[in-house]
């Protein structure tokens, strides 16, 4: 079993790979949803996934790992633990990411940005902008799963444990809406598992 298959198997075992008609946080619609919190509830899966992600950056001399709230907190902590460095997280406030709770980033600090699922890159770009404000040295970006099929690009190296192309649709051009498949906002209703 290759790494991608192993990662997707973890998502399936934890019942995190869902099928239906979903409203994503980006506002797009999709027929597949990865419910990250179904994976994050199992420490043994988080440990495996984050160890693998940390290994992709172990030669980079990372000094701090930063993740966006909410799932990114767990990912940043576990990756930092594996890299034997510190972790902090960026919270959303007023349409942008900020550091609270006394978190600081030092100028030039070698920074790894991590998150759980990459769809449009919105949360990661907000963290990139925050790290730039602090003049941190962004070494790379790591995600558990890139559901954009590699379409989302950053100015920094991106490493994903698995890349899948999950179709997304604009709400006004969604075939699932045309077929009158009920739209579900994840976390709000029981849905079918793959």
How should each PLM-predicted stretch be described?
Residues 1-114, 118-194:
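PRPP-associated nucleotide enzymes
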